[in-house]
Amino acid sequence: TYASAQHIVRNSYYSAYGMTTDFTGVLGAQYIYHFDKCLFMPADLTGGIEFNHDNLHDKATDVQKYRDAALAEDPTATGDRLQQLIEKYTPAPLNQVVNIASVYAQNEWKNEQWSFLIGGRVDKNSIMDKAVFSPRANIRYNPTQDVNIRFSYAEGFRAPQAFDEDLHISNVGGELVSIVRAEGLKEERSRSFNASVDWYHYFGDFQANLLVE
């Protein structure tokens, strides 16, 4: 089992970053079991569960910057008109709470010449309607002690959520940008294929390596 937590409070750098608080916590458990023989060769079975919590709040605080922008649009603005323009240029506060529950498992068969890995992970993000399944597979073959041939496939995803690092990049450059997560966004998906041949060889005290990928 494992657990970690982090709480960030940011209110610095000449008000460019506004006021940001971000609490993240992780709680999980992992189990590993070794088979002397599973079907056709030794294997390691790994399984686990994990829960991630992220609570992000962000509020712009540089009122003078937004007042200057308002007066640049209408130098004669006063009273309610000026306040309306200031509100127009002030980025909307961001309040985002994300909970992610995950379960994963993989089994790796291996000996000195071969290894076969197959596994998968299911993640349920609270800002998404459905859980996402991400599979992975890997095959390794060593025809000789110096040569390693590997083929792998993996899938991944990224949920449509805002991150602390994205909030104030434009503001630091002088642009007034409000980050808002649009409704109905779907997750980004990735599929990765990889094939490689890795060669190692010792020449006395020196080691040579050639990788084709």
Question: How would you label these PLM feature ranges?
Answer:
Residues 1-129, 211-213:
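Face-selective signature of the C-terminal outer-membrane beta-barrel domain
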Residues 1-11, 142, 150, 184-213:
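Membrane-embedded beta-barrel scaffold of Gram-negative outer-membrane proteins
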Residues 21-23, 41, 97-99, 131, ...:
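Residue-level preference for beta-strand/loop junctions
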Residues 28-32, 102-108, 136-138, 152, ...:
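Outer-membrane beta-barrel architecture
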Residues 33-39, 109-113, 133, 141-145, ...:
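Outer-membrane beta-barrel strand-turn architecture
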Residues 40-46, 115-117, 138, 142, ...:
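Membrane-spanning beta-strand positions in outer-membrane beta-barrel proteins
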Residues 61-63, 132-133, 164-167:
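Short, glycine/charged-enriched secondary-structure capping and boundary segments
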Residues 126, 146-193:
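Surface-exposed extracellular loop regions of Gram-negative outer-membrane beta-barrel proteins
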